[in-house]
Amino acid sequence: MSIIFVHGSGGYGDIWRYQTEYFSDSHAVDLPGHPHGQLLSSVEECVDWLREYITARECSDLVLAGHSFGGAIVLLYALKYSQDLKGIIIIGSGARLRVHPMFLAPCEEAIKGNSYQWYQLVEEMYRSTPEDYKKEMIEKQKAIGPAAMLTDFLCCDSFDIMDRVHEIKMPALIITGESDAMTPAKYANYLGTKIAHSKLMIVPQAGHFVFAEKPEVVNKAIKDFVKGISS
């Protein structure tokens, strides 16, 4: 069983390093524009790009895992191309992802050249992750820039499959941090009630980047999930 990890807004594949180093048959993608290539303007476009990526590599026995914006991409992929997948892993995400203006405004200001609030936002997002990881990830996210984050946030803001998510019939692992302020636990609870073959895990003392804050806990959950659908 192979796993492909999809990052969140303004991110890049290396945020999944605790997972890709742990799971030998796994890798993480960089979505277009993060930093190379042209940014995509909707979750639907990202899904179609990911389908081409997967098809070109002839991936089989595949599990898709996504965080936040990446989770939205994985959910919609499961609806459109269920035949490609054995299961999905959704971390810190939801069936609808409205984005508060307090997250949009710093990106907009940074694009105009006023980066202070955006730098604060990026640093706050990684606040609870390990120190060495945090320092490197913040620098990489700043290098990718505010335009990518804003574009991704706007994709999230228009994403809504609340009336369709029940159509997902494949096994799903849903993980969220108990203290996640960006995608509260109620988002995960909704997915857990609507996706028939799902397992919900709320991780104590963890926030939006639960997979980096509590990698041992998350990796064990992923390992058990993949083992369960492989047997």
Regions found by a protein language model. Give the residues of each.
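Gly/Ala-rich beta-loop-alpha elbow adjacent to hydrolase catalytic centers
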Residues: 66-70, 74
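Conserved alpha/beta-hydrolase catalytic His-Asp/Glu region
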Residues: 98-102, 115-166
